[in-house]
Swiss-Prot record:
Short-chain dehydrogenase like 1: region residues: 6-230
Enzyme Commission number, as recorded: 4.2.1.119, 1.1.1.n12
Name of the protein: Peroxisomal hydratase-dehydrogenase-epimerase
Binding positions ((3R)-3-hydroxydecanoyl-CoA): 689-690, 719, 803, 805, 826, 851-852
Short-chain dehydrogenase like 2: annotated segments: 319-535
Keywords from the UniProt entry: Fatty acid metabolism, Isomerase, Lipid metabolism, Lyase, Multifunctional enzyme, NAD, NADP, Oxidoreductase, Peroxisome, Repeat
Organism: Saccharomyces cerevisiae (strain ATCC 204508 / S288c) (Baker's yeast)
Subunit composition and interactions: Monomer.
Subcellular location: Peroxisome
Binding site for NADP(+): 14, 53, 100, 133, 165, 169
Keyword Lyase: yes
Gene Ontology MF term list: (3R)-hydroxyacyl-CoA dehydrogenase (NAD+) activity; 3-hydroxyacyl-CoA dehydrogenase activity; enoyl-CoA hydratase activity; isomerase activity
Amino acid sequence: MPGNLSFKDRVVVITGAGGGLGKVYALAYASRGAKVVVNDLGGTLGGSGHNSKAADLVVDEIKKAGGIAVANYDSVNENGEKIIETAIKEFGRVDVLINNAGILRDVSFAKMTEREFASVVDVHLTGGYKLSRAAWPYMRSQKFGRIINTASPAGLFGNFGQANYSAAKMGLVGLAETLAKEGAKYNINVNSIAPLARSRMTENVLPPHILKQLGPEKIVPLVLYLTHESTKVSNSIFELAAGFFGQLRWERSSGQIFNPDPKTYTPEAILNKWKEITDYRDKPFNKTQHPYQLSDYNDLITKAKKLPPNEQGSVKIKSLCNKVVVVTGAGGGLGKSHAIWFARYGAKVVVNDIKDPFSVVEEINKLYGEGTAIPDSHDVVTEAPLIIQTAISKFQRVDILVNNAGILRDKSFLKMKDEEWFAVLKVHLFSTFSLSKAVWPIFTKQKSGFIINTTSTSGIYGNFGQANYAAAKAAILGFSKTIALEGAKRGIIVNVIAPHAETAMTKTIFSEKELSNHFDASQVSPLVVLLASEELQKYSGRRVIGQLFEVGGGWCGQTRWQRSSGYVSIKETIEPEEIKENWNHITDFSRNTINPSSTEESSMATLQAVQKAHSSKELDDGLFKYTTKDCILYNLGLGCTSKELKYTYENDPDFQVLPTFAVIPFMQATATLAMDNLVDNFNYAMLLHGEQYFKLCTPTMPSNGTLKTLAKPLQVLDKNGKAALVVGGFETYDIKTKKLIAYNEGSFFIRGAHVPPEKEVRDGKRAKFAVQNFEVPHGKVPDFEAEISTNKDQAALYRLSGDFNPLHIDPTLAKAVKFPTPILHGLCTLGISAKALFEHYGPYEELKVRFTNVVFPGDTLKVKAWKQGSVVVFQTIDTTRNVIVLDNAAVKLSQAKSKL
């Protein structure tokens, strides 16, 4: 038996185990002595059909290897309890449950049907509930249990075309967080994983070269470790792929407190302090936290009430005048408060409440004029389109939707019944889907609209006795993240709030202290009004889309994900013992954390970490070895042909590598700059190569040799908290002669990164030529022009010189980062331009460029140059798209040989 983490006689239930990740789980557990229930319905990826063969084949494979297993063919959402019954009947207990079964119904939200939404939620989320609920009494009585819920990056961050899947997967996180809290005293550990693994569900989405690294075998070791009897980890979330293992946790900003008096606690007051709400620095009244529960609102409101009246700032919220707002569950509590506040700002309000919308309408119309508000008593679950039709019939439009309606059916998980699960899911999650779906075509046609969805701290952090509510509210968050992505292209703004207020619904769970502090709904509504305003988008500094805010008691804060630096294993076979040995690295939040906000950011950061680990192994000696073959390959990558023998034939008497080959050892050494250590929240996916400079320290680049490049940071600067600038200096030496061959400076702009004061570097000595500005002389005819056609396959060829970033070859990845096709390497564009200058003006000693736009392989480039003494200022234009791609650019000619 491999390793020392034994599962001998433990009973493990795995759903969706007929193939992919589930199958690998089953084989791994069985190999370590577990008795395995292999569940698989045997349907298609879309969930149709039924075939017992898949589960039977896995069981046969386990038995042939000497293991113990039985098959089960039940549906997780229809007969989940029967899967657990199989374990009890065959083996007498259940110790480990892996909720892994899933289906996909990917389609844009505009085209998604309620059936497509419900089917995915049923299999993933309700299936997870059904299995966990059936296993719970056995695990409690045993005082032992381990449950893994399988989430997804799509659930954590949203993903285009997966509103159903995102909702279901994030719902599983909320469920797991609650079960972890309820199970703690019974030794039941519950965790969530968000794997990026090769499976039936991913093989049609991810490109082949990435899929090669994403074997499900790289996921299993963490799950084995988390479910072992010796492991105490619970209530945690992990991202993992291709040998990378990292932990995710919530990060809540210190936010801002306001005097909660509604006279001055207004949307304007919040806008005036927006920067403070969304920054993550500690403040005297509150610290940035990594919580497992809601804020200490009692402390915050006590401090807030001592503040003077709130400053209103210079911006008045006027954009809501005559806008039409639909607020659900507005007969009292938060909904009523929202409706009144919108009316106060000039909006027309549809007050929806299944019981009594009329008294609120009467109150609003008395305050703000007849016809300001109208009632609607349709059911949010079954009659969502009719609610929106009420708005259209009366006001001919709808601009804002606030999904607020809700119910509670709180019970400990042991006592929770299916009807209580479904009732809460329907009112919260399914009504949010249906109402958002009903306004979507209207907002799309208008090219504008706002949706504010309501989650809960129970959904974010889990809460004892609220498995149904936590799952529904977490699912709303995942759903909102996806429709925010899809809506952004249509002018539809979606955001999410987690309110803390005393209402009829929350009175039953509030403490005496909370009730005495009077957390009025009016302490939430000003933020809701602001989120529905155009002023926020205009004056906040960056668009506010798909964001999560916690609010109440005069306090507003933002909540986001934070990921640990993590651990990467580069071994072909990873064992859970390796996970155990490196647990401190996996859960290390002390350095190199990131705050991924999208699936692309997260996945790119993961794959970059893996690539860096592999590169570090390959470049342990830090040496760059090359031959004439590499020189020819580089020259060909810049467009040299067989007619240019001095560039393409090693026996030509004038054979040489083009001078810009100096950037190749620089590029190979950029990883040694360790930008992830220099800045906070480094994400490779957000890195832009801004400028490049190099100086040749020998008359020509050698055509073969062994070089070593030493890197050091010259500047590390914060750019207003929105980005970081890193400038690195790179000295390249010949190992044999010890002579300096070339010196490079690269400037990198990392969006979303931050540089705290203690990490700033300002005093690095820059090359004089690198920091000069070179403006093209306007109105003056260029001394030299050259038009160069790039080749459709140029990026495919140039990448063989060492830059294997898939962005330059993989259409799927290019589209994921918003490019229609793969782009040409910026250093290739530099090399093509510099070759034209080299052939016209002769050798140069120094070169500096700024990258201002991308080039697509096959585009035509025009190089324009103006000679000014020993300096040639130039500019490169992509004439196919009529954009400048290289600017602020110049070469300094060599005095000895240049064609002056």
